[in-house]
């Protein structure tokens, strides 16, 4: 197996499309460390288009799909260039880019399961001059898996405890949990919404992309009856392996609940925050009840109200962010896709069947050569 140590660049935009996270990662003897990270902003028009498509408010004609695929690739390349500029590193020093792309549809269940990420990797490889690994999820779906979450395999590499059990909690648009133990299988799944619904509600009522520090939610009161209705969704009682996304938990789903219209915007936001906290805490209690600590990462770590609500609902467990372990919580996922590119070039599988439900380990991603 080639060593393939060196510099890799991970790129991802999550379900909230709140920016493209770029992480420049150095691998030494297989151990990853962050050299530089940044979040590259979306052009506002492009972001709104992505969200409209992901929420099925915009039925794309094929020509529009093709153009959006390339526009996203241009934005991803700009993010890659920006993080290289920040680190003062030449593109020639980077072994490969691992590009997750932008998910616009995730349907891993049913007779013809699929997952769809855009951001043409041929364009990224051509414009960046760096070999690019992309299309990480579809091999797992083809093997009967959910294609998500993929980050637990990386969590197991960098955060496995020396004894006992630990939960890694990723607070993106969607929340996912990973249960790690000193020995034994890694398990993980999407619990439901984290920031995605709150972000969308905040954009609708405040014109802001996210609820800074959770202040909008903190200004409202939880409607217990509405919360119970939202928690009644069938997804919350599905056993793992399971994954979800914006095509399920979006504003149109929220609007199907009549009590929403009876509440003030801030009371709905407070209730959405409670939905995230309760569904996450319930999932941890049910499937990782033996974990003594919860390590949080993702954009949601900056929502002080959400972190407080989680701490209240996880008594007896230490809730910390991944920065305690030297991993920037904002770039855990981008680092994971740099790691997946590293795995691909080494010819090593990137999925965990115990997490995704796939028939077995699979090589993830395809390689797009730079000129």
Feature roles, as predicted:
Residues 57-119:
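Short beta-strand-loop/turn "lid" adjacent to the catalytic site in phosphate-handling enzymes
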């Amino acid at each position: 197996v080639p060593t393939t140590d060196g510099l890799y660049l991970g790129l991802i935009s999550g379900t909230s499309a709140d920016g493209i996270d770029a992480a420049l990662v150095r691998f030494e003897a297989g151990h990853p460390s962050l050299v530089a990270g940044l979040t590259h902003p979306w052009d506002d028009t492009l972001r709104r288009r992505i969200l409209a498509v992901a929420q099925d408010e915009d039925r794309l004609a094929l020509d529009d799909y093709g153009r959006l695929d390339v526009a996203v690739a241009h934005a991803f390349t700009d993010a890659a260039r920006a993080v290289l500029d920040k680190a003062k590193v030449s593109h020639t020093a980077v072994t490969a880019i691992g590009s997750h792309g932008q998910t616009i549809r995730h349907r891993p269940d049913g007779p013809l399961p699929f997952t769809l990420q855009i951001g043409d990797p041929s364009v990224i490889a051509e414009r960046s001059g760096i070999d690019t690994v992309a299309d990480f999820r579809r091999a797992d779906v083809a093997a009967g898996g959910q294609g998500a979450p993929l980050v637990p395999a990386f969590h197991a590499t960098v955060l496995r405890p020396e004894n006992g059990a630990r939960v890694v909690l990723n607070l993106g648009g969607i929340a996912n949990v990973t249960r790690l133990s000193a020995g034994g299988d890694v398990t993980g799944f999407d619990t439901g919404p984290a920031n995605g619904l709150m972000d969308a509600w905040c954009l609708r009522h405040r014109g802001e992309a996210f609820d800074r520090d959770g202040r909008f939610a903190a200004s409202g009161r939880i409607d217990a009856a509405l919360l119970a209705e939202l928690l009644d969704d069938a997804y919350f009682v599905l056993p793992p392996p399971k994954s979800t996304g914006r095509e399920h938990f979006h504003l149109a789903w929220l609007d199907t609940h009549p009590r929403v219209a009876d509440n003030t915007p801030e009371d709905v936001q407070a209730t959405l925050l409670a939905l995230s906290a309760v569904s996450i805490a319930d999932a941890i209690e049910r499937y990782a009840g033996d974990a003594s600590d919860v390590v949080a990462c993702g954009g949601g770590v900056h929502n002080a109200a959400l972190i407080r609500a989680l701490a209240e609902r996880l008594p007896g467990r230490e809730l910390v962010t991944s920065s305690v372990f030297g991993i920037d919580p904002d770039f855990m996922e981008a680092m994971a896709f740099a790691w997946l590119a590293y795995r691909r070039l080494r010819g090593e599988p990137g999925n965990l069947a115990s997490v995704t439900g796939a028939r077995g380990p699979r090589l993830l991603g395809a390689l797009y050569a730079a000129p």
